[in-house]
Amino acid sequence: MPRLKVTQVRSGIGGTAEQRDTLRSLGLKRLRDTVVKEDRPEIRGMIRAVAHLVRVEEVE
């Protein structure tokens, strides 16, 4: 199954509480934090909600 490398590139400060909670749910706590997640619809939805704060790459 493909995986997604998600890196936080912008701060959650100034965003809504929902956006900050979504970053935390993805496992991102500070700038330049990177996590690798399975490519699933739930994860894609969370990424879409904070797309302006993260960078996403597909990895094998």
Curated annotation (Swiss-Prot):
Keyword Transcription among UniProt keywords: no
SUPFAM superfamilies listed in its UniProt record: Ribosomal protein L30p/L7e (SSF55129)
Keywords of the record: Ribonucleoprotein, Ribosomal protein
Gene3D superfamilies, per database record: Ribosomal protein L30, ferredoxin-like fold domain
InterPro entries: Ribo_uL30_ferredoxin-like_sf, Ribosomal_uL30_bac-type, Ribosomal_uL30_ferredoxin-like
One of the GO biological process terms: translation
Pfam families: Ribosomal_L30 (PF00327)
GO cellular component assignments: cytosolic large ribosomal subunit
Ribonucleoprotein as UniProt keyword: yes
GO molecular function, a single term: structural constituent of ribosome
Family under the similarity heading: Belongs to the universal ribosomal protein uL30 family.
Classification via NCBIfam families: rpmD_bact (TIGR01308)
Quaternary assembly: Part of the 50S ribosomal subunit.
Protein name as catalogued: Large ribosomal subunit protein uL30
Organism whose genome encodes this protein: Acidothermus cellulolyticus (strain ATCC 43068 / DSM 8971 / 11B)
